[in-house]
Amino acid sequence: RTAEGLHMIAAGLIFAALASALHVYIFVLESFLWTAPRTRPAFGTSVKQAEATKEMAFNQGFYNLFLAVVTAVGIVAVLIDATAAGAALIFAGTGSMLLAAIVLLVTSPDKKRAAIVQGTTPLLALVLLTIGFIL
């Protein structure tokens, strides 16, 4: 790999780690703090809506955690030179994160800001890693 490629890979791994950390945070919000007064405004839910959707949010939170774990394991794999397996895991994790953000944007345009926050770091990770692995 070229020096430029290695720099792109390093930057991509940083963005993948940020995406993973964000999804761990979302996991905590959805699975444990869903009905909390400070959490509800972030998701645009009333007390009644939050209570009614608590079980769904709990499960969705774990989905986000699993995406974060897949991505984190991929990062570790790349760092210990299991590059092919690590890249596959990172692309699966961040690709799913990005696609989920796109689905959110398309189906709930009023949640555009959340979709952008959710999708930016995975997108940057995917772009940088793709370029880095090519170089």
Give the role of each language-model region.
Residues 1-7:
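Short, Lys/Arg-enriched N-terminal segments with co-localized hydrophobic residues
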Residues 7-10, 48-51, 55-58, 81-88, ...:
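Juxtamembrane loop-transmembrane helix junctions in multi-pass integral membrane proteins
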Residues 9-33:
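N-terminal signal-anchor transmembrane alpha helix
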Residues 31-54:
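Cytosolic, membrane-interface loops and tails of multi-pass inner-membrane proteins
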Residues 31-39, 79-83, 109-113, 133-134:
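Transmembrane helix-loop junctions in multipass membrane proteins, especially transporters and channels
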Residues 60-73, 121-122:
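Core segments of transmembrane alpha-helices
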Residues 73-120:
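Transmembrane helix-loop-helix
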